[in-house]
Amino acid sequence: MNSLSFLNHEFEAFPSPELALTDPNGLLAIGGDLRPERLLTAYYHGIFPWFNADDPILWWSPDPRAIFIPGQVNISTSLRKYLKKQPWRFTINHAFTDVMAGCAQPRRKQAGTWITHEIQMAYRELHHNGHAHSVEVWHGERLIGGLYGIAIGQVFCGESMFHRETNASKAAMAVLQQHLIKMNFKLIDAQVMNPHLESLGAKPVKRADFIQLLTQFRDKPVNPAAWIPSEVTLEL
């Protein structure tokens, strides 16, 4: 029977993801902190933090795991037509803090958000250190959508997305896929399946298979120019 591990503030190794609980699915450890080195170690081993504002830090590695393969994100014909008509522009790493703030806004029928101030500060530090990245969708000078995540070698670990205009988050996903293909990324970790991710083409895989893919690509070199702030054209 698997048991929950408790972390202290000393830097220590995470338990194996195979030891995560089945109920709640994927809960592996509790406690610790959100220092950059601990966060990067977590993602390197297929673990991520997810907790509410009043909770201790909770670390997860669910089974199954939601993933995308770059090139297999579903950009439907109707979505392509819709996006071609929009006057939107797209950037990478131009407004990371604002994207996180957008993602942190409570959704409809939600009282709060898991993207707490503590989480935002931690990931902003990762961004400053070159590990966390954002995609932005703009209508004029207004930020209308975007997403952010962590790059580990040739793996992009998606964290959250948001939209303020219809389909803007899907546009951000299309931009991300295009960019990752150009930069030879091999895997997008989407963490937990939900209907929105499924509609975009996410697939559930066994945790062991995900860890195998992560291990295969997490140490692969990446183009040094991959995450230089830039404006991009979405090719539809």
Curated annotation (Swiss-Prot):
The gene is aat. The keyword Acetylation does not apply. It catalyses: N-terminal L-lysyl-[protein] + L-leucyl-tRNA(Leu) = N-terminal L-leucyl-L-lysyl-[protein] + tRNA(Leu) + H(+); N-terminal L-arginyl-[protein] + L-leucyl-tRNA(Leu) = N-terminal L-leucyl-L-arginyl-[protein] + tRNA(Leu) + H(+); L-phenylalanyl-tRNA(Phe) + an N-terminal L-alpha-aminoacyl-[protein] = an N-terminal L-phenylalanyl-L-alpha-aminoacyl-[protein] + tRNA(Phe). The keyword Cytoplasm applies. Transmembrane segments: none annotated. It comes from Shewanella sp. (strain ANA-3). Belongs to the L/F-transferase family. Its main location: cytoplasm. It is found in: Cytoplasm. InterPro entries: Acyl_CoA_acyltransferase, Leu/Phe-tRNA_Trfase, Leu/Phe-tRNA_Trfase_C, Leu/Phe-tRNA_Trfase_N. It holds the Pfam family Leu_Phe_trans. One of its GO terms (cellular component) is cytoplasm. GO terms for biological process: protein catabolic process. Keywords: Acyltransferase, Cytoplasm, Transferase. Functions in the N-end rule pathway of protein degradation where it conjugates Leu, Phe and, less efficiently, Met from aminoacyl-tRNAs to the N-termini of proteins containing an N-terminal arginine or lysine. This is Leucyl/phenylalanyl-tRNA--protein transferase. GO terms for molecular function: leucyl-tRNA--protein transferase activity. Its EC number is 2.3.2.6.
